[in-house]
């Protein structure tokens, strides 16, 4: 898999929403021993723990989702076509993002959000407003 400094190295990445991202990051790092890897404003952060990664996000108003999952894949468009053929509920089609990823999102029958992501470029987080703490 192509390396991208803007993304955690893990293949499966849980995303947990909180009302106060900074407070959650401080608590998770202090209490569980996570390390802050990347900060994006006050609304998103990536944390590391050994070989694992976790994304802390700002909770969306009216959101019923308690968590979501990001899965990194090698061939996003092929993966998307497979999912699309199964009549899954696609909430956003594949798109390229300034942080070097091509992603699409699906909602599963339980209402959980799954974002599938493929690295398309190694992007320095500074170029889009991120602060990288570890590489």
Feature-to-residue mapping (PLM):
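A common structural junction motif
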Residues: 32-35, 86-91
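N-terminal beta-strand motif that seeds the catalytic metal site of vicinal oxygen chelate
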Residues: 1-25, 67-69, 117-135
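Vicinal oxygen chelate
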Residues: 11-19, 45-48, 61-86, 102-107
